[in-house]
């Protein structure tokens, strides 16, 4: 049985995922108005959208530094402030340059939270429930996406020029996150590995695992002592970590070449391309958010029973088929907007059940305690670099090559993902972090 306090701490930390998802998707309802308001060229517009992702890449790359130096909890308090400043600032920005700067600052929070929050949850969760608890982060990402879509739709009905309200409303959950972080303890593994505060760590582990906390303490300390024998143990480039590093890079790469962020960012534009009106496009986008949430909830029930690998195998097959059909509908011409909407909803269902649910769980598990923050940074950095490239290039590519070629590229990439899952991806369900370390690292 999972202790209630562990669930509560995980839910609070997962609110970082809610802000991550809200910030990622809220721009979809405002992006066309922003282009009109500041008379932006396509290149300037692409830069305006992708600058948040550049901030995200930066936040992901440097997120491990505060996570290891001042702790997971204090780092997330700083991130909550960043979200608050970014949301309020973009809502009142008086010129394009300031708006772009504040979008970058908001992106820093998204990137850093994608590194630190999953680490924290994986480090306090018991092995039997780690998948379900870490997936709360992804659940909150898709909940944030859905709420942002719904918020955009409702605000769009209430105001004639709604984009500032769309962006500014995120200040409310940012403030709630900041307040709730006061009630969360520091990660016990961080306390042992970076501060040698064994007594403080023991108090938290006792709340997590009343019967087995002493053995868990012993396992963490033993793993730390083993790593300290290797003078290069803290370097992610140590040959011991080559396999988990490769897994993290490939997993994050395939996550983005599925086309998910292109659809999240540009869903209304895609539906307009498929023939839907503006209001119908926004409402269909909300439907995508609802499907995303529903199938993430379904994955929560199966990730610790079926395992990570089976979810990925099923999802990869579904993504290949749905992306191929979307590509075909664009190739065939005479596009039916409702048909494309249904296909993309099925696509989202397969993505949410597999890649969307598994990525933050899997990457947070596969690295040893000593380099977990660095490993999570590597995976997050790869994820956001690819997201930036796709978000920046998607409007240009669809304009020059059309929807058919664009979605066919995503489909082919999912064929490669299927091979990766089949041939390389290990199963991690039900294993302690120290057991996974012994399996995946070279000694």
Where are these regions (language model features)?
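Alpha-helical transmembrane bundle of multi-pass membrane proteins
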Residues: 1-197, 225-443
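Solenoid-repeat scaffolds in large eukaryotic assemblies
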Residues: 200-204
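Short, well-structured alpha-helical segments
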Residues: 213-225
């Amino acid at each position: 049985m999972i202790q209630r306090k562990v669930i509560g701490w995980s839910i609070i930390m997962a609110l970082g995922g809610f802000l991550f998802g809200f910030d990622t998707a809220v721009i979809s309802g405002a992006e066309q108005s922003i282009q009109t308001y500041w008379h932006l060229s396509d290149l300037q517009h692409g830069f305006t959208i992708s600058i948040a992702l550049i901030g995200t890449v930066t936040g992901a790359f440097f997120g491990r530094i505060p996570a290891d130096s001042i702790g997971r909890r204090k780092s997330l308090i700083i991130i909550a402030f960043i979200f608050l400043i970014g949301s309020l600032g973009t809502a009142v920005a008086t010129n394009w340059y300031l708006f772009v700067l504040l979008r970058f600052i908001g992106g820093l929070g998204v990137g850093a939270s994608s590194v630190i929050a999953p680490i924290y949850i994986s480090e306090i969760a018991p092995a039997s429930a780690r998948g379900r608890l870490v997936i709360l982060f992804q659940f909150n990402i898709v909940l944030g996406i859905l709420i942002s879509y719904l918020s955009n739709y409702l605000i769009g009905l209430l105001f004639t020029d709604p984009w500032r309200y769309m962006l500014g409303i995120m200040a409310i959950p940012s403030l709630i996150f900041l307040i709730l972080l006061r009630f969360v303890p520091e990660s016990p593994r961080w306390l042992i590995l970076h501060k040698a505060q064994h007594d403080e760590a023991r108090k938290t582990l006792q709340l997590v695992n009343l019967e087995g906390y002493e053995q868990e303490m012993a396992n963490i300390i033993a793993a730390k002592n083993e790593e300290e024998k290797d003078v290069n143990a803290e370097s992610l480039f140590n040959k011991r970590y080559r396999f988990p590093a490769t897994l993290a890079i490939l997993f994050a790469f395939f996550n983005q070449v599925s086309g998910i962020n292109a659809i999240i960012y540009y869903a209304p534009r895609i539906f307009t391309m498929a023939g839907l009106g503006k209001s119908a496009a926004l409402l269909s986008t909300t439907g995508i958010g609802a499907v995303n949430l529903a199938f993430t909830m379904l994955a929560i029930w199966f990730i610790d029973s079926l395992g990570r690998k089976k979810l990925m195998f099923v999802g990869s097959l579904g993504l290949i088929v749905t992306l191929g059909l979307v590509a075909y509908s664009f190739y065939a011409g005479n596009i039916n907007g409702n048909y494309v909407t249904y296909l993309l909803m099925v696509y989202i269902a397969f993505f949410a059940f597999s890649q969307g649910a598994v990525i933050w769980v899997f990457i947070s598990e596969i690295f040893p305690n000593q380099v977990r923050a660095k490993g999570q940074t590597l995976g997050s950095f790869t994820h956001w670099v690819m997201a930036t490239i796709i978000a920046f290039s998607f409007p240009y590519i669809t304009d020059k090559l059309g929807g058919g070629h664009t979605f066919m590229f995503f489909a082919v990439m999912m064929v490669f993902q299927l091979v990766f899952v089949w041939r390389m991806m290990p199963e991690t369900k039900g294993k302690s972090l120290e057991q996974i370390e012994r399996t995946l690292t070279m000694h």
